[in-house]
């Protein structure tokens, strides 16, 4: 089966998979080819299938601002035929061996991966190499996919959680590379040409920015041989690559409010500058977010809920009525920065200030130290459990390994992850909250009936509490 992964399935903190869990005697190995390409494998004894894929340290951040959306455009074209395989032959070959090939583009990464039988690993690596290095990029296919991407853009505009977070990136990072959307603006999608696509490949598809990952019934030495055979000729970067391309991104405390009376639900995202993937306080941020929690009106909540914010959301209104429909404490991490905050939804006639005040109160509680050891330990336990449960097959583990290697340059072992989480104390969470939240700039993005949102000045004042 050949398919493109939806950009909307990319995960939040629970989903930006970072961790691995032990399988029966797994063996993790890495090697580096002369051109800088990393080969990593984790064998899973007893399995007859494998996930193999290529992770590239280049996504929409690497787009030329004048042709924003090129990385995502390339993903569409990869399956439309290569110099070696026509689109039809490619589809038939994949179907005939029963493999599942997928791809996605994020702000920092481009990923192509396949799940296949043990006997077909080498053939699948050949196909992956063909897609990445020998795509025809024919003019007819470019024009066909341009229409598809414009339709996809229309669909994105109807997904208000995506809209809110795209706008949040735009106000928090403004004209910097992280402020751009993955699809790119419609006016640029209409103008992207073959030269833009070729230039993106030659600029960003470099050996030292790529990793070939194999998980399952894989042999590391064989994987290295196949990597050298199919990817060994890819050139190395002329100079070391830095994801941001220069200085660290600047976070701006700004806002965007889009009044739309037609929407039955209002979507709001608050953010402060978050943690990068390799930040020393990454896990502390996750524990702090766990204390704030996640809640949805459909599941209800009792007055004895461990999350004070969930209780307020559920019964904080007049007559113990809900003041929100759902909320999520989130962390979105990148190579050199991040976003961190709370996203919530509410009915169009809700007083949004009530929930904003509740969030500010919860952040103030973390900063003041008015949290318990039990809350911290509960959050740590939930975090560890979610990490284990999230990595339940070879594809999830490959995603974990690939993401870590291309974005941080290393992979934490399961033991290291659990040791770091277990070492976090109540004091660490309090210190973290005062470092990351106290008097920090705040960004806001909202779509719907936004009339009851407090002013940005009010939000800024709340961060001083």
Describe the role of every protein-language-model region:
Residues 265, 277-300:
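A conserved active-site cap/scaffold subdomain adjacent to cofactor or substrate pockets
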Residues 46, 51-115, 294-323:
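M16/MPP (pitrilysin/insulinase) zinc-metallopeptidase core fold and M16-derived inactive scaffolds
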Residues 2-14, 18, 32, 43, ...:
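Charge-rich, well-structured scaffold segments of protease-associated domains
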Residues 18-35, 41:
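Short, Gly/Pro- and small/polar-rich lid/capping loops
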Residues 25-26, 252-256:
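Short beta-strand-initiation
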